[in-house]
Amino acid sequence: MANEVLPGWLREAGADAMVMAACILLVLAYYAFHRKRVRRDPTYSIHYVNDMTRRIWVESVMSGTGKDIMAVQTLRNFIMYPILMVSTCALLIVGTLTLSGQAGNIANSWHAINLGGSHSAGVWIVKIMFLLVDFLVAFFAYVSAIRLANHVLFMINIPREAQSGHDVLSPSHVADRLILAGKMVALGMRTLIFAIPLAFWLFGPLYLLIGTVGVVDFLSRLARHQRGL
């Protein structure tokens, strides 16, 4: 039975599977190149510079130089972005689930410009699942960022005399939490960016490939400190 099903599946979704594999390899190759450059020069990455900036900022605020109000306002502004994005991701998840329930009705119309890809409703559901998982990862990344930043909001105003004897309350450990929150925000942003080629995949594998190439080029520019954002 499996031998009868497998060739049919390959004929139906072979192009989509091969293009998806090529896109995954392209993304992995980019991150391998980026990792190699960062090992050689950490300041090549905007993320390294951002982490270093957050660590210096936390140590400055916790040094007791009267920056309590500024620290709270800065962290509040930091938290507002992931709060907004959590709501956005929730709406995207609901919208994606709505699409999955209408696969039989809209798959054919969305495949009007599909060049070489599958028109099967089953493959369409697989595409929707990839998109749904992407939005779920972004959602939990932003939720984690909010959680970590809320902890930092309390920890950063602890008096210096109360920090003695508690290594977990030291500026270094508080900075680690804020840096991790920043990494979660960056993860959420990158995940949403990768939703672009996944959305293009709904129209066909060719558009997935084009979208992935565009996103990798965009991320390569975004991650550089010299031209990063």
Predicted regions: what is each one?
Residues 1-14:
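Short, strongly hydrophobic alpha-helical membrane anchors
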Residues 71-97, 183-209:
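Transmembrane alpha-helical segments and their cytosolic interface motifs
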Residues 164, 220-229:
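Juxtamembrane membrane-interface segments at transmembrane alpha-helix termini
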